[in-house]
Design a protein with these regions (language model features):
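Radical SAM enzyme core and accessory elements
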Residues: 1-26, 30-32, 36-38, 480-608
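N-terminal [4Fe-4S]-dependent radical SAM core
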Residues: 7-37, 44-45, 203, 209-258, ...
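N-terminal pre-triad scaffold of radical SAM enzymes
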Residues: 36-42, 60, 246-273, 297, ...
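Conserved SAM/AdoMet-binding glycine-rich loop
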Residues: 38-39, 43, 112, 295-402, ...
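Canonical Radical SAM [4Fe-4S] cluster-binding loop centered on the CxxxCxxC motif
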Residues: 50, 251-287, 591-608
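Short secondary-structure boundary/capping segments
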Residues: 53, 85, 121, 155-160, ...
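Glycine-rich beta-alpha loop elements in corrinoid/cobalamin-binding modules
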Residues: 73-221, 455-503, 511-524
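Flexible glycine/acidic-rich beta-alpha junction loops that bind and position SAM and/or redox cofactors
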Residues: 76-77, 152, 207-211, 316-317, ...
Length: 608
């Protein structure tokens, strides 16, 4: 692309668009039957930090009949330059226009990237609306955590992959390949062919009806042979670690090597979508992790490695693993990161064991400011445990800690919000009696967003006015104590709640907001709530209907036809437990909670 060479010197971070990175895979286009572009709807340095996309990239490229290439959302200046030069959106590996691919697969991990999906399709010269595509257009598919409520994006995506993609994506590519050879063409026929694969959901094959109050009445298949429920795919064993990941030319958000030590979490925090949709827990062995570390560090040159999971300190042999790592890499100046830790002294001891030299900062998430509210969300930490944990961290040499809280959790009162301030003050008072100048405590607050497939999916989000009032309580209280507070813009949390719990009506609002200029909504400097407010008004949509309305346990939810494997009965039971402040124990270490997965997955631990 000669035109590309002409515009790259004029845009920010041109290395976002050059490709050719170490460990990138360039296959012979003509020697493969199926070509997929793996698309991430945000900039390069964020998408390159996504482990899931890296796993799929390498799995597909191991297949001799298929190739996978990468594409990310160009930044605003690059989009403008591409449109001016009539350069269509292209893949990094071959620089081919996306229109040349058989399939474009989007990873949807955050609702505020939805308008970027539309921008990427438009830049590629592909009709944004699935209803306007024909046989000459690539198949547009999407997966990721947001696909567990696919309805708001149903007008734009031909096919959703529900659940974990490692197996189902290869099945889909094989099925697509067979169709091309045996049938040839016919978009509807192709989709009907692919819809037979478990975990595949084609929104155009379902009729959604609504009640007079705009709630969903039903979602039913249009054709025989189409399943009434789309079931989440789960893999029994984690696929091998990617030990030759693509090495970016520029710094990325998580610029380090990564190994997923385990997948899934059963601690049962009632607000947590990931804790439901990534169940059950599946672990790698210590031997597998250590062997992969050797290869990964050798193939990348990184001197920092993250051991990733939803709760790293719950890995069954975490002490043995850390001991083995310390023994094996002693003196190698290797930094180990444990990004998801329980708030207890054991986690501090783990960090102490892997941290050599200067200690920087620890991060924990108490989530709520009172013991009562933590019981409601099933995060059963006492104030005493939190204070003792931070005191232990201070004694072990840490001078800085960041604490994450949510405001607007179900049943939260002003007293609970003030409890965040009191808890922070108690921490500071307890620690200031120790050495030196005390512990630097940073508080981060964000508004609770009710998510699909969680016990709190029926709960309404508090209003933006209430969010601002509660942030003000924190600002005033923490300022007096000399502690720093950061918070998420309430309007961003509000829009996230709208899109999280939306139905098909929202597709027209997403489309209209995009036409009005909405893009990079996840970026604070680009987020324009007024654009969205106008889109909702023009489309006669009340955002409060989705974000703030409390829903009946009997209501048909827009995502009810998506089966995560966790039963609605279990979610209702957990919702009722929250109102009673009743704890539900982690089924890995106690009795089975009969969430539904015990009937489906061999890795579930069943202790009845």
């Amino acid at each position: 692309m000669t035109d590309l060479n002409g515009i790259l010197p004029r845009v920010t971070k041109p290395a976002r668009y050059t490709g050719g990175e170490w460990n990138s895979i360039v296959k012979d286009w003509e020697a493969t039957d199926i070509r997929i572009a793996l698309a991430y709807p945000d900039v390069y340095e964020i998408g390159m930090s996504n482990l899931g996309l890296s796993i799929l990239y390498h799995l597909v490229n191991k297949e001799p009949y298929a190739l996978a290439e990468r594409v990310y959302t160009p930044w605003i200046d690059m989009q403008e330059a591409m449109r001016k030069a009539s350069i269509p959106l292209f893949s990094l590996e071959s620089k081919r226009p996306l229109r040349d691919f058989d399939i474009i697969g989007f990873s949807l991990g955050y609702e505020l990237t939805y308008t970027n999906v539309l921008s990427m399709l438009d830049l590629a010269g592909i009709p944004v609306l699935s209803s306007e595509r024909d046989d000459s257009d690539p198949l547009i598919i999407a997966g990721g955590s947001c696909a567990l409520n696919p309805e708001p994006m149903s007008d734009f995506i031909d096919l959703f992959v529900i659940g974990e993609g490692e197996e189902v994506l290869l099945e889909l590519l094989n099925s697509f390949r067979s169709f091309k050879k045996e049938v040839g063409s016919g978009r509807t026929e192709l989709l009907r062919h692919l819809a037979q694969i478990p975990g595949v959901y084609v929104p155009a094959f379902y009729d959604v009806s609504y009640n007079d109050d705009n709630t969903v009445a039903s979602c039913t298949p249009k054709f025989t042979g189409i399943p009434s429920m789309a079931a989440r795919r789960m893999i029994a064993e984690l696929t091998p670690v990617v030990t030759s990941p693509v090495i970016p030319y520029i710094a990325t958000v998580h610029d380090r090597a990564m190994i997923e030590t385990q997948r899934g979490c059963t601690r049962g925090c009632r607000f947590c979508n990931a804790g439901i949709v990534y169940r059950p827990v599946r672990e790698r062995t210590c031997a597998e992790i250590l062997e992969a570390m050797d290869e990964l560090l050798k193939n990348t040159g990184y001197n920092e490695l993250s051991l990733l999971s939803l709760s790293t300190s719950d890995y069954s042999d975490i002490e043995g693993l850390i001991k083995a790592i310390n023994l094996k890499y002693r003196g190698d100046n290797l930094k180990i990161s444990l990004p998801s830790l329980r708030l207890d002294s054991f986690s501090v001891a783990l960090m102490d064991a892997i941290t050599a030299g200067k200690k920087t900062s620890l991060t924990f998430a108490p989530e709520a400011g009172s013991e009562r509210l933590r019981r409601v969300i099933n995060k059963n930490l006492t104030d005493d445990v939190i204070i003792k944990t931070l005191a232990t961290a201070y004694e072990h040499g840490w001078n800085s800690v960041k604490l994450y809280f949510m405001i607007g959790l179900p049943t939260e009162t002003e007293e609970d919000v003030e409890g965040i301030v009191r808890l922070a003050q108690q921490m500071k008072a307890a620690i200031s009696r120790g050495r030196g100048g005390g512990l630097n405590i940073k508080i981060s607050a964000s508004a609770f967003v009710p998510k699909p497939h969680t016990p709190f999916q029926w709960v309404g989000q508090i209003s933006q006015e209430e969010m601002n009032e509660r942030v003000d309580i924190l600002r005033r209280g923490l300022k007096k104590s000399g502690m720093r507070l950061t918070w998420q813009e309430p309007r961003i949390s509000h829009l996230e709640a709208v899109l999280s719990r939306g139905d098909r009506h929202l597709s027209k609002a997403i489309y209209h907001a995009w036409k009005l200029g909405a893009k990079f909504d996840a970026w604070r400097e680009e987020f324009k709530y007024d654009t969205w407010a106008r889109a909702f008004e023009d489309c006669s949509i009340a955002p409060s209907f989705y974000a703030n309305r409390k829903r009946s346990l009997a209501e048909v939810l827009p995502w009810n036809h998506i089966d995560t494997g966790v039963s609605s009965e279990f979610l209702k039971q957990e919702y009722n437990n929250s109102t009673k402040e009743t704890a539900t124990e982690d089924c890995r270490f106690g009795r089975c909670n009969s969430c539904g997965l015990e009937l489906l997955h061999s890795k579930c631990r069943l202790l009845l």
